[in-house]
A protein has these predicted regions:
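Binding-site signature for planar aromatic cofactors or substrates
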Residues: 1-170
Length: 170
């Protein structure tokens, strides 16, 4: 399962969450890709603190992560963008993510026009689209147990780079 719930905060301190796809784990950092001009992108540009949640109801497991997000390199974003399906690349170029649009037809027309523009060519990544690497500073692992006596373990990154581990009461 690669779906993660991403939490960010507006400049006014209002939280918002949405589901994105986790695309990798590199050097201990969680990687996902998005439109930098989306609501989450704008919020991360002003406040890099982020939360990630993985929820597996069937397994009665959850992992909650807090940390900071930073853009990955343009080269890393380009590499991943080239691997995306053709229609997803076109969609990334034309979608004004999180902005109001007049109609679905407006989106479809823009898609058809952009697809014709790139016919037979390699679709380039738009500058407003790319990846984020989330460096965790706190991770909580939760395992459901009978009688609500769940297991909870909190990992907190210390200034020396080592993780402190504590069992938490359910």
């Amino acid at each position: 399962p690669t779906a993660i719930i991403v939490g960010t905060v507006s400049p006014e301190g209002r939280p918002s969450t949405r589901t994105v796809l986790l695309k990798g784990l590199h050097d201990g950092k969680f990687i996902f890709y998005t439109n930098y001009e989306s609501r989450k992108g704008r919020q991360l540009a002003q406040n890099p603190y982020i939360s990630l949640s993985f929820v597996w109801h069937e397994l009665e497991r959850q992992v909650h992560i807090e940390g900071t997000a930073a853009k990955v390199s343009p080269e890393e974003s380009d590499e991943y963008f080239r691997k995306r399906p053709y229609k997803s690349r076109i969609g990334a170029r034309i979608s004004p993510q999180s902005q109001p649009i007049a109609s679905r037809m407006q989106l479809i027309r823009a898609f058809v026009k952009e697809a014709a523009r790139w016919l037979g060519k390699e679709v380039e990544r738009p500058d407003n689209w790319g990846g984020y690497a989330v460096t965790p500073t706190r991770m909580e692992f939760w395992q459901g147990r009978p009688n609500r006596l769940h297991d909870r373990f909190l990992y907190t990154l210390k200034t020396d780079g080592k993780w402190e581990i504590n069992r938490l009461s359910p």
